[in-house]
Amino acid sequence: MRDGTPRANRLWGRLLVEELLRCGVGLFCVAPGSRSTPLVAAIAEHPRARALVHYDERGTAFAALGYARATGRPAAWVTTSGTAVANGLPAVAEAATDCVPMLLLTADRPPELRHTGANQTIEQPGIFGGYARWSFDVPPPGPDQDPATVLTTVDQAVYRSQRPPAGPVHLNLMFREPFLPQPAQPDGLPDLWPGDGPYTRYARAAPVPDEAEVRELASALGAAERGVVVAGRLRSRKQGEAAARLAAALGWPLLPDICSQARLGARPEVSAPYHDLLLAGGRFPGGRAPDAVVRVGGVPVSKRLQRYVTGRKPATYAVVADHPFRSDPEHLATHRLEADVAELCAALAGRVRRAAAPGWLSGWLRASGEAGRRLEAALRERKGLSEPGVARLVSRLIPEDHALVAASSMPVRDLDTFADPEGPPVPVAANRGASGIDGTVATAAGFARGAGRPVTLLIGDLALLHDLNSLAMLRGLPAVVVVLNNDGGGIFHFLPVAEHGGIFEPYFGTPHGLGFRQAAEMFGLGYSGPRTAGELSLAYQRACAEGGPHLIEVVTDRRENLALHRELLRGAAG
């Protein structure tokens, strides 16, 4: 059997790659390794296979995640055996938590080498636990195996990664040595396909709520005088627009999260984009909490918004999402509807009657506009650069053809609170499923490739240090990295632990004393270090126009940042 092993490996690898391409997989994120040779060779030799090769498995996994965030389709993460596989867990956890499709193709030793002490062998089947939507341990290629089993396994994997709830799917692929035959013209593939598409065509599944449930919810919403529509994390501008139309039909304000695809380019006739500023003052338009809430999409970034909509249990609290998970940390939901978000919002908008209290919507819009004007005036009075000011400037100046990726921690929060709603309606992405700071640069690299757009990344210094080697994936991309370097963990200054001076700075503030000029030079990025808002505007616009990867470093002070946030929130709240 060993005489036929190299040819069987080559055939298996080529069948896998061909079928993945037929299923619409548009990117292979590859980390070099030996055991995955049959797969990698097939990717390299296929004229339609598009590959991103990077030397860090954690980075390539996050790049696959970013690609899927942009496209809604899975990329294939390809890795060798051993601890290389374990490096995918952070991205897998994020993808599973936020229902992002992902294909995990991990090479492994054959059965006779497991649990023997063989080199670079760990327990790979089941390694991703409950985060994998489906896992399959694929046996080694052999002459007695039907090649069609490869195709149907791939088809099932791609389908399971995208059907609700979307998420990671793991194919653990065993290969025996030798991995490839001697270099020669490869044999043609067997004639297994009836046409140009995949071997097995899966019809797309989409949950459809019961019509009676939709009517009942529409009736409950129509009876509420003071309601709000909260647009949480959404996957497309179409979904954000559908949420806005539902709010308009109800006569309620839309409170959009930065990742709702409705916060930038907000619709002024229905959107209250500065809701976080308003709620910071503890005063609500209309003087009371809502009696009905529709949350569309994921849990929003703003804790103040969450406290507002849940502080007094609403009579109706509906959660609409395209997955079956609970998504209700306060345990207040009265209605939970799983469906295509845009379609369900349209269905509700066509059935509700408008019973909003007079002045409810206009009060929200007026208060939000006033908060925005106070914020603008306060930031204009400041001469130096600040983290809120940088977030606002980027949201205003980002070109319409860009995408915006925000790191978790302070950047996504500052964009949520301070972004200019009149900025271009660009796609916005952040890893807010599990909300880790790891893999942010790699996510942006994958997102840019998936969206087919230049990308602007707003990131903090610790998140950039955490994923520094992923800057290599930005080579050749029109990418602008804006890093806010406050020499440590700025977000911890907003938490009660900041009062514990003896332990705070060494264990939470964690100053590092590092700058990023040399990192930009090492990875081939242009560099700017602006000190004023004017310099930042020029540097950012120049970097966007030049098109190559560029890093802009803005140095700030953590304590000053805390004081400024408090000042802006007090002032904008009125």
Swiss-Prot record:
<dbReference type="InterPro" id="IPR032264">
    <property type="entry name" value="MenD_middle"/>
</dbReference>
<dbReference type="Pfam" id="PF02776">
    <property type="entry name" value="TPP_enzyme_N"/>
</dbReference>
<comment type="pathway">
    <text>Quinol/quinone metabolism; menaquinone biosynthesis.</text>
</comment>
<protein>
    <recommendedName>
        <fullName>2-succinyl-5-enolpyruvyl-6-hydroxy-3-cyclohexene-1-carboxylate synthase</fullName>
        <ecNumber>2.2.1.9</ecNumber>
    </recommendedName>
</protein>
<dbReference type="InterPro" id="IPR029061">
    <property type="entry name" value="THDP-binding"/>
</dbReference>
<dbReference type="GO" id="GO:0030145">
    <property type="term" value="F:manganese ion binding"/>
</dbReference>
<dbReference type="InterPro" id="IPR004433">
    <property type="entry name" value="MenaQ_synth_MenD"/>
</dbReference>
<keyword id="KW-0474">Menaquinone biosynthesis</keyword>
<keyword id="KW-0479">Metal-binding</keyword>
<dbReference type="InterPro" id="IPR012001">
    <property type="entry name" value="Thiamin_PyroP_enz_TPP-bd_dom"/>
</dbReference>
<keyword id="KW-0786">Thiamine pyrophosphate</keyword>
<dbReference type="Pfam" id="PF16582">
    <property type="entry name" value="TPP_enzyme_M_2"/>
</dbReference>
<dbReference type="GO" id="GO:0030976">
    <property type="term" value="F:thiamine pyrophosphate binding"/>
</dbReference>
<keyword id="KW-0808">Transferase</keyword>
<comment type="pathway">
    <text>Quinol/quinone metabolism; 1,4-dihydroxy-2-naphthoate biosynthesis; 1,4-dihydroxy-2-naphthoate from chorismate: step 2/7.</text>
</comment>
<keyword id="KW-0464">Manganese</keyword>
<dbReference type="InterPro" id="IPR029035">
    <property type="entry name" value="DHS-like_NAD/FAD-binding_dom"/>
</dbReference>
<comment type="function">
    <text>Catalyzes the thiamine diphosphate-dependent decarboxylation of 2-oxoglutarate and the subsequent addition of the resulting succinic semialdehyde-thiamine pyrophosphate anion to isochorismate to yield 2-succinyl-5-enolpyruvyl-6-hydroxy-3-cyclohexene-1-carboxylate (SEPHCHC).</text>
</comment>
<dbReference type="GO" id="GO:0009234">
    <property type="term" value="P:menaquinone biosynthetic process"/>
</dbReference>
<dbReference type="GO" id="GO:0070204">
    <property type="term" value="F:2-succinyl-5-enolpyruvyl-6-hydroxy-3-cyclohexene-1-carboxylic-acid synthase activity"/>
</dbReference>
<dbReference type="InterPro" id="IPR011766">
    <property type="entry name" value="TPP_enzyme_TPP-bd"/>
</dbReference>
<dbReference type="Pfam" id="PF02775">
    <property type="entry name" value="TPP_enzyme_C"/>
</dbReference>
<dbReference type="GO" id="GO:0000287">
    <property type="term" value="F:magnesium ion binding"/>
</dbReference>
<comment type="similarity">
    <text>Belongs to the TPP enzyme family. MenD subfamily.</text>
</comment>
<keyword id="KW-0460">Magnesium</keyword>
<comment type="subunit">
    <text>Homodimer.</text>
</comment>
